[in-house]
Amino acid sequence: MAESYLLDKLKSVEQTFNELTRRLGDPDTASNPDEYQEIAKSRSSLEEVVNTYEIWKTAQEDLIGAREVYKESASDPELQEMASLEVKELEEKIEHLESRLKVLLLPRDPNDEKNIMLEIRAGTGGDEASIWAGDLMQMYTRYAQTQGWKVSLVSESRGEMGGWKEVILEIKGNDVYSQLKFEAGVHRVQRVPATESGGRVHTSTATVAIMPEVDDVEIHIDPKDIEMTTARSGGAGGQNVNKVETAVDLMHKPTGIRIFCTEERSQLQNKERAMQILRAKLYDIKLGEQQAAVTSMRRSQVGTGSRSEKIRTYNYKDNRATDHRLGQNYSLTPVLDGDLETLIQSCISLDQQERLAELATSAAN
């Protein structure tokens, strides 16, 4: 591997991995379940890097041997040809392993493993924008189902002609944030609305926010900053309807963020859910400030997650979904049916390429 900074990093990771392995075998560690679990998790996060590095080192040794055989077999054309093929195969294998190692060494987003709050807000376009927000909600729900994730409706404000003015979903599962974080931004649709009698194509938008779930340790909220009122809910049917004040209207005074929760069956549950959404929103603001500092130095093609950033256009007439960051078109129907995997992986790959280029540049300076 030509890049010495990567070799140094790999050696450091290997040393850390070996030390963590040693500590796991220490009786003192085994007697402390919390410490043992934390060390085991840290070790597990390095395991793929170390295993790939070991395969790379073995391949390097094999390559040295194959080149030696090639040099010494000048008098045996058949053996030399076999050695030549082995050299080529090993060089390709090493190149692939080095590419993989570079990706594995990229700093991992600490939020990648988290569950999320997915918020969709109708933008420009009136009733059609609300209907479009509903279509996006269905798209993400279907994608989540293909991933085996659990989707729950936590807050909603329905549109007059269907769809939602605003809807918040909670999505739980493995690595949800890592898969969906690049979906944040403005989603534009071009189509003839169901409400359009003249057959004219309209352009409407909806804004998607992807917020990692956080606990009260990560985001502290002063109770004095909260103003809460209750209301009667028309939610869960039966004798509760319009008789018990289960709905919660919560205002965070410093930011002006307002959350109205009616989906749970009790006032306490709705209050807890509203606080959960508020923590996610405040953390999202904090993340946005951090990302703004980074992107002031480097403009990311894959996107900053800004709510004002147009990331995709869905054209019904041409059955085409265009991702503006990737500069690629996709068939619209499968995308709306939740077939987002290729698109999402392309965004992840683009982000990795950008960060690798940045890493190489910083190492050269």
From Swiss-Prot:
Matches recorded under InterPro entries: PCRF, Pep_chain_release_fac_I, Pep_chain_release_fac_I_sf, Prokaryotic/Mito_RF, RF-1
The record ties this protein, via SUPFAM superfamilies, to:
Release factor
Keyword Protein biosynthesis assigned = yes
Q: What post-translational modification does the entry describe?
A: Methylated by PrmC. Methylation increases the termination efficiency of RF1.
Q: Which UniProt keywords apply?
A: Cytoplasm, Methylation, Protein biosynthesis
One example GO MF annotation: translation release factor activity, codon specific
**PTM-bearing positions, type N5-methylglutamine:** Q239
Tell me which GO cellular component terms the UniProt record holds.
cytoplasm
Where does the record place it? Answer: Cytoplasm
Major site of localization recorded for this protein: cytoplasm
Q: Which family does it belong to?
A: Belongs to the prokaryotic/mitochondrial release factor family.
Name of the protein described by the UniProt record: Peptide chain release factor 1
* Organism field: Nostoc punctiforme (strain ATCC 29133 / PCC 73102)
